[in-house]
Curated annotation (Swiss-Prot):
Protein name: Nitrogen regulatory protein areA
Zinc finger (GATA-type): 525-549
Transport as UniProt keyword: no
GO biological process: one example: positive regulation of transcription by RNA polymerase II
Feature: compositional bias, Basic and acidic residues: 39-48
Compositional bias (Polar residues): 442-452, 479-500, 575-584, 597-624
Source organism per UniProt: Penicillium chrysogenum
C-alpha cells in the first residue's frame, strides 16, 4: 500500500483528533472559518482530498488540509496571496465567501492575509482628464496633450495655459470677461472690516463663485451653453445659476482696538465717517436673463482697477450710496456732539454688520452694531425743496432735530397743497402724513386718545384747511400769552386736543380773508371743479375735494360721477333738536338722543355748534359768530360733560350695542323714547347704521375701546365723520 504510506505521515491520527476536540473551545468558531491552504500545495497533491474522504477515520477534510499545510515548510501560512486566486483555485471557489461578524477584531486577524483596505489606493484611481468626452473624441491631439488630472498648482496652471491657447476667441457679450490668472477679483484685502480677520486665500486659479458651466471661464468652449432639459436653443436660460460669494455681512468680525474706531469717533469728521463703509452691492441689473450667468461680485469699482473687457470690479474707495441719488452726510453738521455715544461698545467680541435699524429703536444710535447711518440723507435745511409742495422745517441747523424723528418735541411743518399739518411728536414710521387712508378730518377716538394711547401718540390726522379752523386758531393765538406764533414752540405747547395753538393759519377758500396776508387762490374740487361747498375734504392723495365728492368717495369707494353734480346745496332742517317728524335727519336725532338723557327740553343751534361741530382750542377760545363761516367736520369737545351729565352717567344702565334699520326696528330690541320715529322714517333710507349708547360708559375712556373696529368708538367715529353737518 504505497498510497497509504504517502498519506500516513500527513494523515491525522484519530487519537490526535479526539485530543484536539477535547481541548478546543466549542464556542470559538473563528479557527474553522478561514482556510490557510495555499493553491500551490493544493494542486501538488490532488489525490489527498479524495483518498482522505474515503478513509473511515471520521475527520473533517478542512482539518486535513489545515494539518497538511502546517506540515509543509516550503511556504509560510501567512504568505500574501491574492484573494481572487485563492478563491478561484480552491475546491469550493464557486461559493461566495461569507465572513461572519463576531466579537473578535478581524482587522488584526486579516492583517497577514493582505485583505484589501476600504480606501482605494492612489495608483488604482482612474485618470480623468478635466474635459468632456465629446471634446476628447473630436480632438485627438487635445486628449494626447492633456496631462493627467491632478490638484497640484503647477499642473493646473499648465492645463489652463493649454486650454487658453486652444480656446477660440469669443465675441458674444456673455463671454466678454475673461479672468486673468491669479487676479484678485474681490479686493477683500482692501476692505477695512476684514483686515483683522486674516488674509483672504488667493490660491484659487479660477473664481470660487463661478461655475465651470458658465461662459466666462477658460472652459466656456468645452461645454454646451444650453441645458439638456431645455428645448430652447438659447444661452439666455441656465439652471442652476452660479452660486454667490459667501456673505460678509453676517460674518463676525473682531472690533478695532488701539487704532481708529470704526464707529463714531470722538471728533466726527469725514475721515472717521469713511472708515467703515456699507458694502455697495451691484447696482446695474440687466433686464435679460443673461444676468444670472454673470458672476455675482459684491463690490462696485471706482478706483480705476478695471481691466479691458472685464466686468469684475474692485472695492469702492469713494463714499458711494446704495440708492439712486448718493448724497453725503457730514456727521458734524447733522449729528450733535452730545447727541449720541461716540465710543465703540467693548462689551462684545464680535459685531455683526447686518443688524436691522428697526430692531433697536429705543437705544442710542451709536450702540448699533458697527454700521454707520445710511448716507442717503442730504443736509436738510430751509433752502432744500424736496418736492413742489412738501417742505421740511429745518429751523435747527446743525442739530439732529432737523432729521425727521429724533426728538418728540420738534415741530415739523409740512405744506401739502394749500393746507397745513398740525404739530405733533414725530416718529420714524410717521412721515407726517395723514393717519387715515381717506385723509379726511380726525375721528373722535383718535383725537380723544391722542395723549392717552401710546400706539396713537403722535398721529394727528387733521388738516387746518378751512377758514373756520384758521379763524379759531388765530383767535386762540391772540388770546394766549405767547403772542405771535413761532416755528418752534416749547414742549408745553404740544396739542392737547384736536388742534394746536401753534399752527400757522391756512389758506382760505372764498372771500373770508379776515386780515390774513397769505391767502392763496381759491381751492377747487379736483373731481367736479366746484368752489362752493359747505365742507372741504381730501382724497387719499391729499387733493382737495368738495363735501359731496368726498363723502361719495368715502362711502362708495369710487369717484363721484359728474352727472350727480347740482348747483343747489340742499340744507337740512335744523329748526329744533327735539323734533320727531318724519323728515328729521340723523344728525338731529343724534343730538336729541344726547339731550334726552340730559333731560333738556331743547337746545339752540349755537349751543349745538359749540358742543359738536366747532373744534375747541387749548386756551378756551370761543366759536366765531360770523354768518359766513363754513363749518368743518371736527371732533366733539375734549372737556368733561356738565355736572348733570356726570350725575346721569352714574345712574344710566348702558344698553348693548344694537343696529337700527331706519324703516323698521329689529325684532327683539326695545326702542327708546327718542328712537320712536325710526319706524316712520322714509323707506329710501335703508342702510343699517350701528349706533352707540347716547352716553358712553366710563370704560369708553379706555384707549383700547376706540381701536376695536365695530365697537362704540367706531360707531361714534363713523357718525362724526359722515354726519357732522
Amino acid at each position: 500500500m504505497r498510497l497509504s504510506d504517502q498519506v500516513s505521515p500527513a494523515g491525522p491520527d484519530p487519537s490526535h483528533d479526539m485530543n484536539l476536540d477535547a481541548t478546543s473551545d466549542p464556542m470559538n468558531l473563528d479557527d474553522f472559518i478561514v482556510p490557510f491552504d495555499s493553491p500551490a500545495e493544493h494542486s501538488a497533491h490532488p489525490s489527498v482530498d479524495r483518498n482522505f474522504a474515503a478513509t473511515p477515520t471520521g475527520s473533517i477534510p478542512i482539518k486535513s488540509r489545515k494539518d497538511h499545510a502546517m506540515t509543509d515548510s516550503s511556504t509560510a501560512a501567512s504568505f500574501p496571496h491574492p484573494p481572487q486566486d485563492q478563491r478561484t483555485n480552491s475546491e469550493f471557489g464557486y461559493v461566495p465567501r461569507r465572513v461572519r461578524k463576531t466579537s473578535v477584531d478581524e482587522r488584526q486577524f486579516f492583517a497577514g492575509l493582505s485583505v484589501p483596505t476600504r480606501k482605494r489606493p492612489a495608483e488604482a484611481s482612474p485618470q480623468v482628464p478635466p474635459v468632456s468626452n465629446a471634446m476628447m473624441a473630436h480632438s485627438s491631439e487635445l486628449s494626447a496633450a492633456l496631462p493627467d488630472y491632478s490638484l497640484d498648482h503647477h499642473l493646473l496652471l499648465l492645463l489652463f495655459l493649454a486650454m487658453a491657447q486652444w480656446a477660440p476667441p469669443t465675441s458674444s457679450p456673455s463671454h466678454a470677461f475673461q479672468h486673468s490668472l491669479r487676479l484678485d477679483t474681490y479686493g477683500i484685502n482692501e476692505d477695512h472690516g476684514l483686515n483683522s480677520a486674516g488674509p483672504y486665500q488667493q490660491n484659487f486659479h479660477f473664481s470660487p463663485s463661478d461655475s465651470p458651466m458658465t461662459a466666462g471661464n477658460p472652459f466656456s468652449s468645452l461645454y454646451a451653453q444650453t441645458p439638456l432639459a431645455s428645448s430652447l436653443n438659447s444661452t439666455e436660460f441656465f439652471s442652476p445659476p452660479p452660486s454667490g460669494y459667501q456673505s460678509t455681512v453676517s460674518t463676525p468680525q473682531p472690533i478695532y482696538e488701539g487704532e481708529q474706531s470704526i464707529f463714531f469717533s470722538d471728533a466726527p469728521s469725514a475721515e472717521s465717517h469713511t472708515q467703515r463703509r456699507i458694502p455697495n452691492y451691484i447696482q446695474q441689473r440687466q433686464s435679460n436673463l443673461s444676468a444670472s450667468l454673470q458672476p455675482r461680485y459684491m463690490y462696485n469699482m471706482s478706483n480705476g482697477e478695471s481691466h479691458p473687457g472685464s466686468a469684475v470690479t474692485g472695492p469702492p474707495t469713494t463714499n458711494m450710496s446704495g440708492f439712486s441719488v448718493p448724497q453725503h452726510v457730514n456727521p458734524s453738521q447733522v449729528l450733535g456732539h452730545g447727541e449720541f455715544s461716540t465710543t465703540a461698545p467693548a462689551s462684545s467680541m464680535f459685531t455683526f454688520g447686518g443688524d436691522s435699524d428697526n430692531e433697536d429703536d429705543d437705544g442710542n444710535f451709536g450702540e448699533r452694531g458697527g454700521i454707520t447711518m445710511p448716507n442717503d440723507f442730504a443736509s436738510l435745511d430751509e433752502s432744500v425743496d424736496m418736492s413742489a409742495g412738501l417742505h421740511w422745517d429745518g429751523g435747527f441747523p446743525g442739530s439732529v432735530q432737523s432729521l425727521p424723528g429724533f426728538s418728540a418735541q420738534t415741530r415739523k411743518h409740512v405744506t401739502i397743497g394749500s393746507t397745513d399739518m398740525i404739530d405733533g411728536p414725530l416718529e420714524w414710521n410717521q412721515g407726517g402724513t395723514l393717519g387715515r387712508a381717506h385723509g379726511s378730518a380726525a375721528s373722535v377716538s383718535e383725537v380723544r386718545n391722542q395723549n392717552q394711547d401710546p400706539r396713537r401718540y403722535g398721529k394727528v390726522p387733521r388738516t387746518a384747511s378751512t377758514p373756520n379752523a384758521a379763524a379759531l386758531l388765530r383767535q386762540s393765538l391772540n388770546g394766549s400769552a405767547s403772542g405771535l406764533p413761532t416755528n418752534h414752540p416749547s414742549p408745553s405747547t404740544l396739542p392737547e386736543s384736536g388742534l394746536s395753538s401753534r399752527c400757522l393759519p391756512a389758506r382760505q377758500p372764498g372771500g373770508l380773508k379776515n386780515g390774513s396776508t397769505n391767502a392763496g387762490p381759491e381751492p377747487a374740487c379736483t373731481n367736479c371743479f366746484t368752489q362752493t361747498t359747505p365742507l372741504w375734504r381730501r382724497n387719499p392723495e391729499g387733493q382737495p375735494l368738495c363735501n359731496a365728492c368726498g363723502l361719495f368717495l368715502k362711502l362708495h369707494g369710487v369717484v363721484r360721477p359728474l352727472s350727480l353734480k347740482t348747483d343747489v346745496i340742499k340744507k337740512r332742517n335744523r329748526s329744533s333738536a327735539n323734533t320727531l317728524t318724519v323728515g328729521t335727519s340723523r344728525s338731529s336725532k343724534k343730538s336729541s338722543r344726547k339731550n334726552s338723557i340730559q333731560h333738556a327740553p331743547s337746545t339752540s343751534i349755537s349751543s349745538r355748534m359749540n358742543t359738536s361741530e366747532s373744534p375747541p382750542s387749548i386756551n378756551g377760545s370761543s366759536t366765531l359768530g360770523k354768518p359766513g363761516v363754513v363749518p368743518i367736520a371736527a371732533a366733539p369737545p375734549k372737556s368733561g360733560p356738565p355736572a348733570g351729565v356726570a350725575q346721569a352717567r352714574a345712574g344710566v344702565q348702558v344698553a348693548p350695542r344694537r343696529q337700527r334699520r331706519l324703516e323698521k326696528a329689529p325684532a327683539g330690541s326695545e326702542p327708546d323714547a327718542d328712537d320712536s320715529p325710526k319706524s316712520a322714517a322714509p323707506p329710501s333710507r335703508s342702510k343699517v347704521v350701528p349706533l352707540a349708547p347716547a352716553m358712553a360708559p366710563p370704560a369708553a375712556a379706555n384707549p383700547a375701546n376706540h381701536s376695536i373696529a365695530g365697537g362704540q368708538g367706531a360707531s361714534q367715529e363713523w357718525e362724526w365723520l359722515t354726519m357732522s353737518l
